[in-house]
């Protein structure tokens, strides 16, 4: 490794220049807000770069952050103390014994499913894989004619990457094989498991498509008549967002609430889930504090008052994407990426003139300090923050993995900025792209590729150049993850962005192209998300990338659907429901 370091030159983070940017306070932008005929809000500011030039600019109208620096730094939790770790260890041993000693095959599978939903399955991975491995090779313990057990077994095996054929459901279909048997409609628990299992389908699996349609139709009817409160709650939850599309930790609290109401609740499992939740929350708070210190030190939110100050929301995203406890470094890194993507996105979408955006793109393509000097002051600090961050991450990867990631990281950030410029040109020309033209660019402009690129280099144990090349030719798993991220984002933010005068999003592109209603367009986008998940599911079963990189790629898509599940902007506009979910995970301990 030492010889490799001698041969690779990574630009030194340009901290020597960073301090000079804070002397630009005399050039801070002066805002006065006016409305325009194009919709949205505009700000009039002066850029003092010699001669004073009046430039009309948009503003996003975003609200200030709900958590200032001092508030974030004040968070503390007793659950980071050693005594809680020791207590949890004792309960983990007890649950391991339950898994080993449970003789009922279905009860074992149900316990595994509960552990996953409670967010504590990470403590039992070896035991779970051993149990599922035995279930994969022996079917004798499960009645293949029982829909509930068959569907539960199928779903868990696929979730753990076992190759299970959809043919296990053939015995539940009618004689012609065209639909499922009508006699199943009274098996509500079985239908719920069938519905959940259907979301692990890959492209071309017709039986699972039939299963989804059949189960959905009858579960929607059961919601209106079923009197079992716990079962009804599970059905409503699944119809809102199926288990396979849900992130684990952000959902854990609500499942703990549901689990403790069940008559078959295990007190030890419940107590472990509550304690573990509070311990993880304590860890998350420490990571958030570190990310917040970095954000404060960049000065971006002070020098660029038009950008979204959302460091807490940026961190919240990471808790669903990088779920394993030991990857705190990666969560903090991802928080920084989210903050930088958000900042640069606001520069392109809201504030920069087309000429400035072209200058910024050229500077990013050249990737050197000299290019930065041609930028207006507000862009210089943005450029330098990104430049320093990427070089620092490349250095850490070289130090820890012995691999120079610099050219790959530069490529993905340049690609992101170039996609932003394409959309800026559409805006200034008043261009309305077709849905195909829009998606060709927007799955890149959503910002998922830099996230996955950085995570690839951190989460791959032994990095091979061939794998790095495959990843950065935008492998199908990257494309699927970013496509779902884009479409889910569009479903939640498109109306707000169109009101600001932005280019049409996927919903509006479809409406313009097909002369469709908004609801028809949204239904089409939902179908695109479903189709893309089938591509994702196939990649999850067959991908040559590391198991955990595949997992975080899927989690990026899941977190997008979690944030935007009610088709409103839970990030930029601080939607009250998302705000509550964020507080419950990061700040409110479980009593």
Curated annotation (Swiss-Prot):
Recorded consequence of changing residue 447 to S: Lost ability to produce 1,8-cineole, alpha-pinene, beta-pinene and alpha-terpineol, but strongly increased ability to produce sabinene and slightly acquired ability to produce limonene from (2E)-geranyl diphosphate
Superkingdom per UniProt: Eukaryota
Q: GO molecular function terms here?
A: 1,8-cineole synthase activity; magnesium ion binding; myrcene synthase activity; pinene synthase activity; sabinene synthase activity
> Which InterPro entries does the entry mention?
Isoprenoid_synthase_dom_sf, Terpene_cyclase-like_1_C, Terpene_cyclase_plant_C1, Terpene_synth_N, Terpene_synth_N_sf, Terpene_synthase-like, Terpene_synthase_metal-bd, Terpenoid_cyclase/PrenylTrfase
What does the UniProt keyword field contain?
Answer: Chloroplast, Lyase, Magnesium, Metal-binding, Plastid, Transit peptide
Instruction: Give the motif span (DDXXD motif).
Output: 345-349
**Keyword Chloroplast listed:** yes
Query: Which pathway is recorded for this entry?
Result: Secondary metabolite biosynthesis; terpenoid biosynthesis
At which positions is Mg(2+) 2 bound? 345, 349
Q: Which GO terms describe its cellular component?
A: chloroplast
Tell me the function of this protein.
Monoterpene synthase (TPS) involved in the biosynthesis of monoterpene natural products, components of the chemical defense arsenal. Catalyzes the conversion of (2E)-geranyl diphosphate (GPP) into 1,8-cineole, and, as minor products, alpha-terpineol, beta-pinene, alpha-pinene, sabinene and myrcene.
PANTHER family named among the record's database cross-references: OS04G0344100 PROTEIN-RELATED (PTHR31225), TERPENE SYNTHASE 10 (PTHR31225:SF9)
Complex and partners: Monomer.
Q: Which protein are we looking at?
A: Cineole synthase 1, chloroplastic
Q: Which species is this UniProt entry from?
A: Salvia fruticosa
Q: Which lineage?
A: Eukaryota, Viridiplantae, Streptophyta, Embryophyta, Tracheophyta
């Amino acid at each position: 490794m030492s010889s490799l370091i001698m041969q690779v030159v990574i630009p030194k983070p340009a901290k020597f220049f960073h301090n000079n940017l804070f002397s630009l306070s005399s050039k801070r932008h002066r805002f006065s807000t006016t409305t325009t005929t194009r919709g949205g809000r505009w700000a009039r500011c002066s850029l003092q770069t010699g001669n004073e030039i009046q430039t009309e600019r948009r503003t996003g109208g975003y609200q200030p952050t709900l958590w200032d620096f001092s508030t974030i730094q004040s968070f503390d939790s007793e659950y980071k103390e050693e005594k809680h770790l020791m207590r949890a260890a004792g309960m983990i041993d007890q649950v391991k014994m339950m898994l080993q000693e449970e003789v009922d095959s279905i009860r074992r599978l149900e316990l595994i499913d509960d552990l996953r939903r409670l967010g504590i399955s990470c403590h039992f991975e070896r035991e779970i894989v051993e149990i599922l491995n035995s279930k994969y090779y022996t079917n004798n313990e499960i009645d293949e004619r029982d829909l509930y057990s068959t569907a539960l077994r199928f779903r868990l095996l696929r979730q753990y990457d076992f190759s299970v054929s959809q043919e296990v459901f053939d015995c539940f279909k009618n004689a012609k094989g065209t639909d499922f048997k009508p006699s199943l409609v009274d098996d509500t628990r079985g239908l719920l498991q069938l519905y959940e299992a259907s979301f692990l389908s890959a492209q071309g699996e017709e039986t699972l498509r039939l299963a989804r349609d059949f189960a959905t139709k009858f579960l929607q009817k059961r919601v209106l008549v079923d009197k079992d409160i716990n079962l009804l709650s599970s059905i409503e939850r699944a119809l809102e967002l199926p288990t396979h599309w849900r992130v684990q930790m952000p959902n854990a609290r609500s499942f703990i609430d549901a689990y403790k109401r069940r008559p078959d609740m295990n007190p030890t499992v419940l107590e472990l889930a509550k304690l573990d939740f509070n311990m993880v929350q304590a860890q998350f708070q420490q990571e958030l504090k570190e990310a917040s210190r970095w954000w404060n030190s960049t000065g971006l939110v002070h020098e660029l008052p038009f950008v979204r100050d959302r460091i807490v929301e940026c961190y919240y995203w990471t808790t669903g994407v990088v779920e394993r406890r030991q990857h705190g470094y990666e969560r903090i890194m991802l928080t920084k990426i989210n903050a930088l993507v958000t900042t640069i996105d606001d520069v392109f979408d809201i504030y920069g003139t087309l000429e400035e955006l072209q200058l910024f793109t050229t500077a990013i393509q050249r990737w050197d300090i000299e290019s930065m000097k041609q930028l207006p002051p507000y862009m210089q600090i943005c450029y330098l923050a990104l430049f320093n961050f990427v070089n620092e991450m490349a250095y850490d990867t070289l130090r820890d993995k012995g691999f120079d990631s610099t050219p790959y990281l530069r490529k993905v950030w340049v690609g992101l900025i170039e996609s932003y410029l394409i959309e800026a040109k559409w805006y200034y020309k008043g261009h309305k792209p077709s849905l195909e033209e829009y998606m060709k660019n927007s799955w890149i402009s959503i910002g998922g590729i830099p996230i996955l690129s950085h995570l690839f280099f951190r989460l791959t144990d032994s990095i091979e150049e061939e794998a790095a090349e495959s990843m950065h030719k935008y492998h199908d798993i990257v494309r699927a993850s970013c496509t779902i991220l884009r479409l889910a984002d569009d479903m939640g933010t498109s109306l707000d962005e169109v009101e600001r005068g932005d280019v049409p999003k996927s919903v509006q592109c479809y409406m313009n192209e097909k002369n469709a209603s908004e609801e028809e367009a949204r239904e089409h986008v939902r179908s695109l998300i479903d189709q893309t998940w089938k591509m994702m599911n196939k990649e999850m079963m067959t991908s040559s990338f590391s198991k955990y990189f595949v997992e975080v790629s899927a989690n990026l898509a899941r977190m997008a659907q979690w944030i935007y599940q009610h088709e409103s902007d839970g990030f930029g506009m601080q939607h009250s429901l998302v705000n509550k979910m964020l507080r419950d995970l990061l700040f409110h301990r479980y009593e």
